[in-house]
Amino acid sequence: MTMTMKSLSDERLIVQAVINGMGANLLLDTGATVGLLSDGIKRKYKLILGKKFPRKLVGAGGEFTAYYCHTFAYVGGKPVTQFLVADIDNVAASVREQTGIEIQGIMSLPQMKQAGIQIDANDNLIMIEE
């Protein structure tokens, strides 16, 4: 069985998630190899941080340091794991400027595959295998 969700935006693929019982918006990024949660939400969402990630990450927002995160996000009731916590303010600002939506994190392609997520980009639909 498959659950279908509509993206919160037509400009970017954004889904609603739950992190520690609170709603969050995650940008789906098929070009990302790691999932990121904003370091700006770590207190409010009570993120459990681990050790410093051993490498610098380079992305659209530049180069940055990240920490392992031991907190899951749930999308359509399915757990999404393996997030890092980093400063994603530049990416979040770009998304907010384009869509008016505040994101709390970025879900990577490996995470989407792990959660059984498929994308219909033409109709901005996200299908999740249950």
Residue ranges of each PLM-predicted region?
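Pepsin/retropepsin-fold aspartyl endopeptidases
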Residues: 1-130
